[in-house]
């Protein structure tokens, strides 16, 4: 009986964690011919209620613009801020993004990110 209950709880927790992961959609990728070896990448990020991302960095310039809901952002050494639709946020190439989450546990959140990054480089880099 205890094993069956443990299995049920494990399944529930796994489903909850999977539901909270961000959905990322690529909108555009473009070589920036006036900036040698650089490209622009535009994505949308959608957080389910209570959703968040782990600590990360981008090794790129990242310009964030909130479309729906509210998101909480913080880079290492900076203050935690809550952004609402129409507000923006910037991350530099050396910034470690320590907080990135939906501010709500009941409403989804969505934002656009424009990256200026090294051509062919991955969007995410390990946090240092």
Where does each model-flagged region fall?
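Extracellular/periplasmic catalytic domains that process cell-envelope and extracellular macromolecules
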Residues: 36-37, 57, 65, 82, ...
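Ligand-binding loop in jelly-roll beta-barrel domains
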Residues: 80, 95-120
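Extracytoplasmic
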Residues: 37-42, 61, 78, 94, ...
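N-terminal targeting signals for Sec/Tat export/insertion, comprising classic cleavable signal peptides
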Residues: 28-61
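Histidine-centered metal-chelating micro-motifs
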Residues: 52-54, 72, 89, 93-102
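Glycine- and acidic-residue-biased ligand/ion/polar-headgroup-sensing regions
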Residues: 58-77, 87
């Amino acid at each position: 009986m205890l094993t069956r209950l443990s299995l049920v709880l494990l399944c529930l927790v796994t489903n909850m964690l999977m539901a909270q992961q961000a959905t990322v959609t690529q909108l555009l990728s473009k070589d920036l011919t006036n900036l040698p070896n650089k490209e622009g990448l535009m994505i949308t990020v959608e957080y389910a209620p209570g959703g968040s991302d782990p600590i990360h960095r981008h090794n790129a310039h990242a310009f964030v613009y909130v479309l729906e809901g509210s998101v909480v952002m913080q880079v290492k050494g900076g203050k935690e801020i809550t952004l609402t639709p129409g507000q923006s946020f910037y991350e530099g190439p050396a910034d470690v993004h320590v907080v990135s989450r939906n501010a709500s546990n009941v409403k989804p959140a969505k934002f656009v990110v424009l990256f200026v990054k090294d051509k062919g480089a991955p969007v995410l880099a390990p946090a240092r």
